[in-house]
Design a protein with these regions (language model features):
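C-terminal scaffold of the Radical SAM
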Residues: 1-168
Length: 168
């Protein structure tokens, strides 16, 4: 996670108006299981630093089906995320792709089964709604005014500009 306030201020000064953080979880054991380089404190500090740098349109990602994740730890993650100055949350299910570090029996056996994933998804939708994050796409939730304009333009077939090494 980038916690350099000067870099964030520079982005803001160059008219970047939205920033997204791949937080994934508020549980350090789950983050470690994912091989993430940050812990929950570093993630929270990065979001708070972005807010302090002037960003008020900040998105965070939650991952469902992480090894070790339970219904209770998911609620803790949702509470962690909604305690931060986020206006948007994306919730994605872990998908193990062939040829990746997760493509092994140990990891496949550690992730939630389909029924549990469905329960976690429904739990996420309900918990986020109770915290003011309304669902507007299958995996996206926003507070009032926090919807991703890029996503909406994409789904409505409008033009947009992609910038960066993976832009298309």
């Amino acid at each position: 996670c980038c916690t350099d306030e000067n870099a964030l201020c520079s982005l803001k000064a160059h008219n970047v108006n939205r920033i997204s953080f791949g937080l994934q979880s508020g549980n350090d054991n789950e983050l470690k299981a994912l091989g993430r380089r940050h812990n929950s404190k570093v993630g929270a500090d990065a979001v708070k630093t972005a807010y302090k740098a002037g960003f008020d349109n900040i998105s965070g990602d939650i991952m469902l089906g992480i090894p070790l994740q339970t219904s209770d730890s998911l609620i803790e993650t949702i509470n962690y995320m909604t305690s931060l100055p986020l206006s948007h949350i994306s919730a994605y299910m872990l998908k193990i792709e062939k040829g990746t570090a997760f493509d092994c029996d140990e990891m496949r056996n550690a992730v939630a089964d389909d029924d549990m994933l469905c329960d976690m998804y429904l739990q996420t939708v309900g918990q986020l709604a109770s915290k003011g994050f309304l669902q507007y796409e299958i995996s996206n939730f926003a507070k009032e005014g926090g919807k991703s304009r890029h996503n909406l333009k994409y789904w409505h077939g409008e033009e947009y500009i992609g910038i960066g090494p993976s832009a298309h």
